[in-house]
């Protein structure tokens, strides 16, 4: 078994357990404590911004060069030469496809939240308000007993209503898994399709940071919404398996070693790059940098995240 294959298998196992622990630990240990939630939100917000910097470097320093190299190999097989920026165009197609899928899912769910983000800690606060913690996690007076109160005319919060997810029904569960994991499969594909060890390591760090934070946000949401542990475990296992599934698909495509597999690899890596763009700019930076608290510190963590991954690519781990 080659070292590259071993690295990818370890990535599959690592991401799965990071996400599983991140989503289940809050269900077990977090109580409905406002001050604890306040502190957790600030720490995770900084980690999320650091993850945004990691994803920037992953996208532009690791994944984009890989897509260019793969496309060049495919074009050389057909003796085709062009100066058109095919890699960049493919990534933008992936970006628009991810936006379309997200909006399609949310349209059918008749809701307006993003897939999952740290606004789960801030549901119900007015957009751009000075305080990120104006609305409590648990409603007062018995009306709103979950993390997410009913929306009002003056409420701009967009948290994911995980209270409904504990109810039985395969269609509801399928809708949830698709909403949370559509882009996770493409992140896994990007890992599985890589042919160089240092790019696998760079992508793994970026994916692990982001998806672990996603899992923690999901776990805290389930804890606040009193989702039963058994249902939370089923949900956590299902969501955590999405990136390993993507890695496995990528491994299968890459191992075929044919012209068709090379074309598929180039196309899928380009589309996966668009998913990374979506996560970086619309899920992380757009939401973290619009808040008025700790803005300069968040910029510092953004630069640090980028520098760490850019340095790893430069040193060719």
Curated annotation (Swiss-Prot):
Modified residues (Phosphoserine): 125, 129
Compartments, record wording: Cell membrane; Apical cell membrane
Pfam families the record matches: Zip
Catalytic activity: Zn(2+)(in) = Zn(2+)(out)
Membrane topology: Multi-pass membrane protein
Cytoplasmic compartment residues: 25-42, 107-172, 221-232, 287-294
The keyword Nucleotidyltransferase is annotated on this UniProt entry: no
Assigned protein family: Belongs to the ZIP transporter (TC 2.A.5) family.
Function: Transporter for the divalent cation Zn(2+). Mediates the influx of Zn(2+) into cells from extracellular space. Controls Zn(2+) accumulation into dentate gyrus granule cells in the hippocampus. Mediates Zn(2+) reuptake from the secreted milk within the alveolar lumen.
Record-linked PANTHER family: ZINC TRANSPORTER ZIP3, ZINC/IRON TRANSPORTER
Record's protein name: Zinc transporter ZIP3
Species name: Rattus norvegicus
Lineage: Eukaryota, Metazoa, Chordata, Craniata, Vertebrata
């Amino acid at each position: 078994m080659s070292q590259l294959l071993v690295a990818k298998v370890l990535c599959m196992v690592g991401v799965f357990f990071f996400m599983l622990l991140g989503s289940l630990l809050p269900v077990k240990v977090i109580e409905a404590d406002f001050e604890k939630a306040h502190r957790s939100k600030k720490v995770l917000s900084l980690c999320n911004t650091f993850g945004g910097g990691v994803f920037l470097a992953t996208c532009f320093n690791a994944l984009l060069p890989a897509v260019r190299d793969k496309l060049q190999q495919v074009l050389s097989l057909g003796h085709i030469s062009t100066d058109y920026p095919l890699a960049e165009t493919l990534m933008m197609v992936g970006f628009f496809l991810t936006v379309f899928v997200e909006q399609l899912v949310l349209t059918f769910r008749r809701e307006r939240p993003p897939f999952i983000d740290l606004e789960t800690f801030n549901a119900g606060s007015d957009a751009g308000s000075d305080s990120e913690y104006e609305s409590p996690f648990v409603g007062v007076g018995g009306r709103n007993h979950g993390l997410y109160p009913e929306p009002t005319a003056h409420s701009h919060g967009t948290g994911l209503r995980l209270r409904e997810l504990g109810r039985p029904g395969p269609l509801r569960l399928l809708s949830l898994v698709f909403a949370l994991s559509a882009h996770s499969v493409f992140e896994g594909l990007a890992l599985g399709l890589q042919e160089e060890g240092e790019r696998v390591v760079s992508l793994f760090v970026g994916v692990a940071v982001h998806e672990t934070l996603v899992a923690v946000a999901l776990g805290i949401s389930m804890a606040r919404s009193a989702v039963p542990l058994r249902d939370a475990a089923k949900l956590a296992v299902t969501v955590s398996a999405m990136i390993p599934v993507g890695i496995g698909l990528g491994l299968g495509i890459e191992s075929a070693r044919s012209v068709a597999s090379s074309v598929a690899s180039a196309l899928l890596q380009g589309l996966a790059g668009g998913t990374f763009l979506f996560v970086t700019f619309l899920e992380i930076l757009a939401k973290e940098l619009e808040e008025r608290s700790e803005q300069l510190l968040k910029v510092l963590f953004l630069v640090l995240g980028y520098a760490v991954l850019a340095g790893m690519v430069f040193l060719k781990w």
